[in-house]
């Protein structure tokens, strides 16, 4: 028995040694795995730190990369020349072949069959339009150019040729320059568009400056009229109703002008209209009174002022959201505003810009239009962004001696079209549109206080859904080259670039 036990012990010793070796190997593997994981984490951390440093150093802030996605220009707002003008024709030709190939490859891969069909039809219409133009059939050529533009509004060749037609045949150099700009934005290597812009840029800048000087003269003429003038007081009262009527109408309110006036004067409900439509009118009334009583006299506009303005706009419609930044992502047609996490820093930058020397050095109309665009682009609220932006714009204009500008609800499509163009990189058409509305509003006041018959367009009008500005648009006092200067798409700027009654 003792010998058997000894043999068993001798056999167990090798087995125990093998188990110890296996345990040691497992421990080594575990140690290696831990070391490997640590090394991976360390490398990943270094890469993350390097990326973070690169982003913050290039943008100046943690949110710089996100701000670039929602870029709001902070310099050279109305510069008529762009970065393409600094390149020579030879430099552009140097990378033209590569650029054209990359663009055609990317566009060709993304175009649908319907879009390809539209482009083919547009190019056919474009060729026919040029033939009509060369044979002197200008009316047919104009319709064909507009048809081509409607089919392919982003095609550089269509934009270029239509711009040339507008410049040389229609003498509409402002709109032609706008199309050259769009063609260059889509295809920077388009040397013809570049050459055309280099020719038109100075002329367009001069026309814009003359237009602003004309607005200043009309503002000064209006300022010279004594406040006690009874006609001026009547015009201001009627314009007040008009301003609220059109501003809520742009957002879809169906109240007529007479109903809007009734709600404001009597505070009585109108049969067949929703509570929200009543409350939108009352909110605008509160906001306008706040502007007249407080903001117009202030030297600086703060975020608190903007929030107070918005709180009154939504005070009757949505008092919970009124005066509060949105807390969720919103989508506005094809525009995706910044996320809620970026609103604080964007609005702080907006406030800084509003009160900066740079912005205050701009012409008041340019300044007000840009403030409107910047605020509506950020879209800081769940609702009421458009109304608040228009109210802020008018606050800035009133501080400069201008009356509150009326944007007619019948021009809603143009208004949104110019905002869309601004999102695409060209703010000038929107600024010109605001200048148009400013001039028409000034003309209404001057007309009302003149010795001419007191049938005031837009201040005394029928309740039709037709053209509110029909009488104004039948008269133009603009330079020929400036006619329809802020046109939109097909139709070449209907309803814009025209001035009011003499």
From Swiss-Prot:
Q: Indicate the annotated site residue(s) for Important for autoinhibition of adenylyltransferase activity.
A: 251
Molecular function GO terms recorded:
AMPylase activity; ATP binding; Hsp70 protein binding; protein adenylylhydrolase activity; protein homodimerization activity
Protein's UniProt keywords contain Endoplasmic reticulum: no
Q: Does the keyword Transferase apply?
A: yes
Q: Could you tell me which residue ranges the Fido domain spans?
A: 301-436
Query: Region labeled Disordered — which residues?
Result: 1-24, 478-502
TPR repeats by residue range? 122-155, 156-190
Q: What's the catalysed reaction?
A: L-tyrosyl-[protein] + ATP = O-(5'-adenylyl)-L-tyrosyl-[protein] + diphosphate; L-threonyl-[protein] + ATP = 3-O-(5'-adenylyl)-L-threonyl-[protein] + diphosphate; 3-O-(5'-adenylyl)-L-threonyl-[protein] + H2O = L-threonyl-[protein] + AMP + H(+)
**TM region(s), chain numbering:** 38-60
Q: Where is this motif: Inhibitory (S/T)XXXE(G/N) motif?
A: 247-252
- Give the CC-aspect GO terms: plasma membrane
| Topology of this chain in the membrane | Single-pass membrane protein
Q: How is its activity regulated?
A: The side chain of Glu-251 determines which of the two opposing activities (AMPylase or de-AMPylase) will take place. In response to endoplasmic reticulum stress, mediates de-AMPylase activity. Adenylyltransferase activity is inhibited by the inhibitory helix present at the N-terminus: Glu-251 binds ATP and competes with ATP-binding at Arg-390, thereby preventing adenylyltransferase activity. In unstressed cells, disengagement of Glu-251 promotes adenylyltransferase activity.
The entry's localization annotation reads: Membrane
- Which keywords label this protein? ATP-binding, Hydrolase, Membrane, Nucleotide-binding, Nucleotidyltransferase, Repeat, TPR repeat, Transferase, Transmembrane, Transmembrane helix
Q: Which residues bind ATP?
A: 251, 332-335, 383-390, 415-416, 423
Which residue ranges have biased composition labelled Low complexity? 15-24
For the biological process aspect of GO, one term held by this record is: protein adenylylation
Free-text note regarding domains? The fido domain mediates the adenylyltransferase activity.
So what family is this one in? Answer: Belongs to the fic family.
| Assembly notes | Homodimer.
The task this protein performs is described as: Protein that can both mediate the addition of adenosine 5'-monophosphate (AMP) to specific residues of target proteins (AMPylation), and the removal of the same modification from target proteins (de-AMPylation), depending on the context. The side chain of Glu-251 determines which of the two opposing activities (AMPylase or de-AMPylase) will take place. Acts as a key regulator of the unfolded protein response (UPR) by mediating AMPylation or de-AMPylation of Hsc70-3/BiP.
Q: What is this protein called?
A: Protein adenylyltransferase Fic
Q: Which organism is it from?
A: Drosophila mojavensis
Q: What is the lineage of its organism?
A: Eukaryota, Metazoa, Ecdysozoa, Arthropoda, Hexapoda
């Amino acid at each position: 028995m003792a010998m058997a036990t000894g043999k068993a012990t001798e056999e167990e010793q090798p087995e125990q040694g093998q188990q110890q070796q296996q345990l040691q190997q497992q421990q080594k593997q575990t140690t290696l795995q831990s070391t490997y994981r640590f090394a991976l984490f360390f490398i990943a951390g270094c890469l993350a730190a390097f990326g973070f440093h690169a982003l913050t150093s290039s943008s100046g802030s943690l949110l710089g990369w996100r701000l670039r996605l929602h870029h709001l220009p902070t310099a050279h707002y109305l510069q008529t020349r762009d970065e393409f003008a600094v390149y020579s024709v030879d430099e552009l030709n140097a990378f033209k072949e590569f650029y054209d190939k990359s663009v055609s490859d990317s566009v060709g891969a993304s175009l649908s069959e319907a879009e390809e069909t539209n482009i083919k039809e547009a190019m056919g219409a474009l060729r026919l339009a040029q033939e009509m133009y060369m044979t002197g059939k200008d009316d047919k050529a104009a319709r064909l150019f507009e048809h081509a533009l409607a089919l392919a509004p982003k095609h550089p060749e269509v934009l270029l040729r239509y711009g040339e037609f507008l410049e040389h045949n229609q003498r509409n150099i402002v709109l032609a320059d706008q199309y050259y700009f769009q063609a260059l934005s889509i295809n920077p290597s388009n040397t013809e568009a570049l050459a055309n812009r280099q020719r038109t840029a100075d002329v367009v800048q001069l026309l814009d400056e003359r237009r602003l000087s004309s607005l200043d003269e009309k503002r000064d003429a209006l300022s010279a009229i004594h406040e006690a003038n009874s006609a001026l007081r009547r015009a201001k009262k009627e314009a007040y109703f008009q301003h609220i009527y059109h501003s809520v109408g742009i957002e879809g309110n169906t109240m007529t002008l007479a109903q809007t006036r009734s709600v404001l004067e009597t505070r009585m409900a109108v049969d067949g209209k929703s509570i929200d439509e009543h409350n939108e009118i009352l909110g605008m009334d509160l906001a306008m009174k706040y502007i007249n009583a407080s903001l117009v006299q202030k030297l600086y506009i703060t975020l608190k002022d903007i929030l107070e303005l918005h709180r009154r706009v939504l005070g009757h419609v949505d008092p919970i959201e009124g005066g509060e930044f949105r807390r969720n992502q919103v989508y506005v047609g094809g525009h995706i505003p910044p996320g809620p996490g970026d609103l604080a820093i964007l609005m702080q930058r907006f406030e800084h810009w509003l009160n900066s020397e740079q912005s205050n050095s701009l012409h008041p109309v340019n300044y007000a239009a840009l403030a409107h665009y910047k605020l509506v682009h950020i879209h800081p609220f769940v609702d009421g962004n458009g109304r608040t932006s228009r109210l802020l714009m008018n606050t800035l204009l009133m501080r400069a001696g201008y009356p509150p500008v009326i944007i007619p609800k019948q021009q809603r499509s143009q208004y949104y079209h110019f905002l869309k163009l601004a999102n695409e990189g060209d703010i000038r058409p929107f600024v010109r549109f605001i200048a148009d509305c400013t001039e028409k509003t000034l003309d209404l006041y001057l007309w009302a206080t003149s010795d001419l018959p007191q049938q005031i367009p837009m201040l005394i009008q029928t309740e039709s859904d037709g053209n509110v500005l029909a009488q104004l648009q039948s008269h133009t006092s603009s330079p020929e080259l400036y006619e329809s200067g802020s046109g939109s798409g097909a139709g070449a700027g209907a309803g814009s670039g025209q001035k009011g009654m003499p």
